[in-house]
Curated annotation (Swiss-Prot):
One of its GO terms (biological process) is interleukin-1-mediated signaling pathway. This is Early growth response protein 1. It comes from the Eukaryota. Belongs to the EGR C2H2-type zinc-finger protein family. It holds the Pfam family zf-C2H2. Transcriptional regulator. Recognizes and binds to the DNA sequence 5'-GCG(T/G)GGGCG-3'(EGR-site) in the promoter region of target genes. Binds double-stranded target DNA, irrespective of the cytosine methylation status. Regulates the transcription of numerous target genes, and thereby plays an important role in regulating the response to growth factors, DNA damage, and ischemia. Plays a role in the regulation of cell survival, proliferation and cell death. Mediates responses to ischemia and hypoxia; regulates the expression of proteins that are involved in inflammatory processes. A zinc finger (C2H2-type) spans 1-18, 24-46, 52-74. The record marks 3, 7, 13, 31, 35, 59, 63, 69 as: Interaction with DNA. The keyword Zinc-finger applies.
Amino acid sequence: CDRRFSRSDELTRHIRIHTGQKPFQCRICMRNFSRSDHLTTHIRTHTGEKPFACDICGRKFARSDERKRHTKIHLRQKDKKVEKAASVSATSSSVAAYSSSVATSYSSSIATTYPSSVRTVYSSPASSSYPSPAHTTFPSPSIATTYSSGTATFQTQVATSFPSPGVTNNFSSQVTSALSDMTSTFSPRTIEIC
């Protein structure tokens, strides 16, 4: 052929393609190769040697081109995660905007009877030394409307009348607490017990 090479070893290697000469032989299975690097790679199939490790997951490979192909899998996975995170971010911001508009559309009396999961701090119109307990989770207003108003009113009255130990307070009572009305009639010792 008319190909030219700048180095003699490249010419020698190329001539073996035309002649079919394979001077490098595996001593284990007697298979012949035209290039020494191909023999070296082949011997790894017998020894199990895998000197090329993936920098991301640590998986090992006998050939560098296998590692390179494998690394592309991680790059595709990374691209998918970035795309997914971007779509989740866009979705969560639109949900947050919807939630805040829904939370502001209810009047304060309905919000007291049917609290939403949106965390809101209400200041009490009346001073009270016994704040009402805060609930960590509430049903959404649409779910709460399935309960009868008598039940919801009873639950609200119970929640605002009796403090619960160990519960963090995020809401101040809009209703004057029953305990605050009774503090003047109890002695300090009785108040500590309650």
